[in-house]
Amino acid sequence: MQPNDFQGFIQAGGHLFIFLITGGLTLYFATERLWAEFIVSLFIRGTSASFFKGIAAHELGHGTVFKTKALNSLFLRFYSIISWHNHHEYAMSHAYHHRYTLHLEGDREVVLPLEILMGRPFYLLQIFTLSITGGPVTSGIIPIMKGTFQTAFGGKGASVISEEWSNALYTNHAKERPHAIKWARLITLFHTCVLLLALYSGLWALPLVLSTQQFTANWLKHFVGLPMHCGLRSDVADFRKCVRSITLDPISEFLYWRMNWHLEHHMFAGGPCYNLKKLHNAVAHDMPKLRTFFGAWKEMLEIKQQQQLDPNYEFDTPVPSASKVINGKNAALTESIGDLAPARLK
């Protein structure tokens, strides 16, 4: 269950290959004024690249994709800067999310109840075109850019989740703040250079390819990402009751960096994403019934109906009683969150 450089290249390098191919095609179609092809290519690119922020950068932030730490670091910085992702801020937040999952006092990265916005036409329009305001598990161009600029100029931007959560993190870990500010400035500098290069070269589509792809066509990220915690229990110590795993088709699972095995990821956060299915099979006897994609959404919509009658309702996932004691070797795996937490949080 240890990281492997070859499998790491398949995941991180494969996603990068898609990024390069779709980027080249999008620019080509734009320069040749093949508008139908351009729109389709831009949509496919956004669908793929929307998984960079908080997914690709998230898994690389755990330091478990590659055995070679320098490769983890290199790909983390690439995926972060291209997707407006401040991995320093996120590392603080996500360390708490893993240690205090859905306990409001210690985890405000995910706060229940998560809203299902399927009945809002403007939100649906955004996730299939350009996400302006964002929403649960999707990136809005206004809040992300605003939060990045605020952090870059010394403020406490809400580029992770909320300004309140950012303030709480920085209050307790002030020494991490300079790293986040420096990275926000690098993000700002990079995307400013992209814009200036586009203006100088006349390649007007360049910012759409290198700067706004994170906010384009967030539909798949929304549909596969929202089920991970939505409608489940808060303030419980059993991951099986507050995290949901679902089965996906191979393409979606690849783009989502296998995070559909989300329960296994929370239980074994120090394990590589490409081994999560194996981990599931190893402990399947102790796990709740595995949901399908459509089954999870059906369950979520039923929970939403219950919450309209009782706002405090949370679904209590039926689970088998634990049947095996974790040995010392596996205990180390369950306790680890990889290299995610900054040194002062470990």
Regions found by a protein language model. Give the residues of each.
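Non-catalytic, topology-defining segments of multipass membrane proteins
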Residues: M1-T47, I82-P207, C273-K346
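Juxtamembrane/interfacial segments around transmembrane helices
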Residues: F66-S73, M92-Y96, Y123-T133, R233-R244, ...
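Aspartate-rich (DDxxD/NDxxD/DxxxD) Mg2+/diphosphate-binding motifs
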Residues: I55-L74, L102-P113
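Transmembrane alpha-helical segments that form the membrane-embedded catalytic/substrate-channel core
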Residues: G46-A57, N86-Y90, V209-A237
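Histidine-centered catalytic micro-motifs
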Residues: I55-H62, Y90-L102, V224-G231, L255-G271
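Active-site-flanking alpha-helical
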Residues: T22, G61, V65-F66, V236, ...
